[in-house]
Amino acid sequence: MPIDQPQEENAYVMDAESATEMARLLNQERLMTQGMGGLFPERADDLSDIHDMLDIGCGPGGWVLDVAYAYPDIQVTGIDISKRMIEYARAHARVQYLDNAHFRVKDALKSLDFPDNSFDLVNARFVVGFTPKTAWPSFLKECLRILRPGGIVRLTEADTSSSTSLAVDQLNMWMPMLLKRAGFTFSPDGRSFVVMTVMRRLLREAGFENIQKMAQSIEIAPGVEGYSMAVDNTKVTFQTVMPTLVKMGITTPEEFEHVYNTALLDTR
């Protein structure tokens, strides 16, 4: 039986136990996999040298389940701090008879509680959303510890996007400002996430070698596949973080309502 860590207060800016957040993450996982061109576009989906894989911050497990289904010979483990999301992921693994998909409740910012050399590939998406900037060195060293010699850590991060809508641009500016004030980004002014700018240095200092970077641009526009998913993701994200934005003094309830409603009109 998998051993779960007890839940403690975490740094995630969203409500990790929220059903709304669970639905948003499932939607976001589909959007990202589709927009990036598949589960492993950088490898042309060739995982012949991968036997054991870990997904850090797996949420409700959508990516893990997709990988486990596509690659039945690979053992895929997902960890997340949310007990509710892990229970959801386990239930779906059972329903889909995915015996190679495993899930555990764990805080990725603490010891990962796996033996050294456990995995061939460690995957993590949007780590900036739950990792204070001071925690990156220890987080990456822990990833290196559990990787086998020649193993891969695969990180996916995003930076701020631009839009033809001033209201959408304003919304997009608020998120890095929120993370900056929460101590999560490396930006000096909170105008962007910046994490990709410092990633190579962080990886090198943690002991990683053969560092490679693959830049991708995901088009989000009317008529483009995935547009409605992206709009829904934006809606739910900002509905959820609005109280925090106001509490931190980034905006006011009145300004938020005006900008948010204008953005909805602009993206219809």
Annotate the PLM regions.
Residues P137-I152:
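A short glycine-rich, Lys/Arg-flanked "PGG" loop and its adjoining helix->strand segment in the class I
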Residues I152-Q239, T244-K247:
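Conserved catalytic/acceptor-binding region of the Class I
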